[in-house]
Amino acid sequence: MVSASLDGGLRICVRASAPEVHDKAVAWASFLKAPLNPENPEQYFFHFFVEPEGVYVRDQEKRLLEIDFDKNHLDYERKGHRGKNELIAKALGVAKGARRILDLSVGMGIDSVFLTQLGFSVIGVERSPVLYALLKEAFARTKKDSLKSYELHFADSLQFLKQNKGLLEVDAIYFDPMYPHKKKSALPKQEMVVFRDLVGHDDDASLVLQEALTWPVKRVVVKRPMQAEELLPGVRHSYEGKVVRYDTYVVG
């Protein structure tokens, strides 16, 4: 997976034309270690656009990745949800009083944002610099009151766990590691294509889970595809849906 830097060779540039966003574009170009408005942008696979209306990413195939919690284009609201009866809420221990969650892999924020709607307070960690930039802007622009207190960190999840153990008060840890996408003939929507190209999959997922299980929390929940093996042995209970399941490890 892309680490918390772009030194691994991710080909990305930052593009901006409006004068009012110049300073923001300079800041993000510095953060991403990417050139701003290069003479030959076609040489870069990913383009990070900074515009007055917001930021977004396009790849060379013109596929779009945008994070906007108010547009709900990625079904952030999940209308018709069952509230605390949702599998993810049950897995995290809402019935046991769990309220403060550490999300180790925010990604596009779909599960994190949903958890805030269910009444959880969420601390999120994202190690892809591009996704972090998109998320940071989305949280800054959102009008949703439930997201105003969201705490987002740019960090490698494994290092974050090691450095912050005992320093954060959380009831449960949530982890949704990326897994290899094998069915190339059935590509998902364009956002997921760009997302997977950006972040790949989590080679260190089992190490992250091992470290998470050392934290003083009530439980650790791992989201898995229905047919996938347990990330580590010791699952106390699995909350199974049609496509995914939530493996729960009881810690304390």
Curated annotation (Swiss-Prot):
SUPFAM superfamilies: S-adenosyl-L-methionine-dependent methyltransferases
UniProt-annotated binding residues for S-adenosyl-L-methionine: E126, R127, D176
Stretch forming the signal peptide: none
Predominant location: cytoplasm
Location(s), subcellular: Cytoplasm
Cellular-component GO terms for this entry: cytoplasm
GO molecular function, one term: rRNA (guanine-N2-)-methyltransferase activity
InterPro entries per record: 16SrRNA_methylTrfase_J (IPR007536), SAM-dependent_MTases_sf (IPR029063)
Its EC number(s): 2.1.1.242
Domain of life, source organism: Bacteria
Keyword Chloroplast: no
Keywords tagged on the record: Cytoplasm, Methyltransferase, rRNA processing, S-adenosyl-L-methionine, Transferase
Reaction catalysed by this enzyme: guanosine(1516) in 16S rRNA + S-adenosyl-L-methionine = N(2)-methylguanosine(1516) in 16S rRNA + S-adenosyl-L-homocysteine + H(+)
Family stated for the protein in its record: Belongs to the methyltransferase superfamily. RsmJ family.
Name of the featured protein: Ribosomal RNA small subunit methyltransferase J
Gene: rsmJ
